[in-house]
Amino acid sequence: MKVFKIAIYSFLISGSLWSCIPSYSAYPREYNHAKADFKKQKVFVVNKDLESEFKILKHSDIYEIVEDSTHAAKITLHPMMKRTPPCGNPMIGSMLTVGLLPSGFPYDIAYSYDLAENSTTKNYQYKLQVYQSLWLFNIFRLGRTFSKQSGKALLGSYIASNK
């Protein structure tokens, strides 16, 4: 009887953990369909060691990132500030229903960088919104990572600010 109880608890815990598959979306929703159909400026990223920020910039496709700094503008990334909900209560529904009940979390991101070109430096600041969804059926949306969707939100914000 004790072995049966342990097996049931193990199954429930592992099922709960496996059922909550994350997927991310850029907000507003029209940013998911934004395309970089403009001439891209060649830039060299000075501090690629900020990996998350660099991946977001790379996925945004706003600039053509080059490895040679001689004939390109220089971008200095700033650490992004991420605000998430203070607790994980929305996730409980997904865990108890083995992923059948979707739940989600909004992420508010303050993203900024400096673009230095011809002895002038311009600071760019964006407020990005990304929504994380936890749901069993997100298994069909596996390519929607945080950095890719944040990149789409950055591209959408960039296009909206340059209209």
Listing of model-derived features with the role each one plays in the protein:
Residues 17-37:
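Bacterial Sec signal peptide processing site at the extreme N-terminus
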Residues 1-22:
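Sec-dependent bacterial lipoprotein signal peptides
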Residues 58-61, 154, 158-163:
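Sec/Tat-exported extracytoplasmic proteins
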Residues 76-121, 137-145:
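Surface-exposed short loop/turn segments
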